[in-house]
Amino acid sequence: TDPGLVPVDGRNTSGGRGWLGIAGAGCDVQVPFAGLGNWVVGVFGDYSFMDVHEPMQEFLFQGDAKQTDAWAVGGRVGYVVTPSLLAYTNGGYTQSHFNQVNLQAAGLGPVVGFTPANTYNGWFVGGGTEYALNFSWLPISGLFWRNEYRFSSFNKTDLQFSLPTGAPSGLAIHSQPYEQAVLSELVWRFNWH
């Protein structure tokens, strides 16, 4: 904690609710390993735009943290289990942005202060499967159904608690967000055969 600020102690673990959309790009290469050509290595990047609200409770204060966007770059290693199924693990760097949080005293009455918007840096690790949708009735080829679990851990920071006027209160809320996400998405692979 910043030596000039008094920490407001509390531990908050909550689930976010809302929606998100993802756009990404990457490149995978199938490589032989120990005589097996079923291994896949790749790099990727993705950007998530979202409106996810997470309740925040710290000591006597509560508010609603809103996560607005995130991006990640990383690598993955996978194994082609069948010609249509890839199982993989991934990891890398991530960054996410949270808006200003308006705080109320125990959730009652008017806003008594706020914490500033903040961008967090961190790392992620995850894994999942991709299944080729090789159906003759589909108008395009290279369509996959991906299911992925991703755990992200972000840096620690002290968010200064400011009064509604913007004046500093001398209090800080210690924050270290982490996130768990389960995603199911359609992926189109160009140059897939």
What spans do the regions from the language model cover?
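Gram-negative outer-membrane beta-barrel domains
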Residues: 1-193
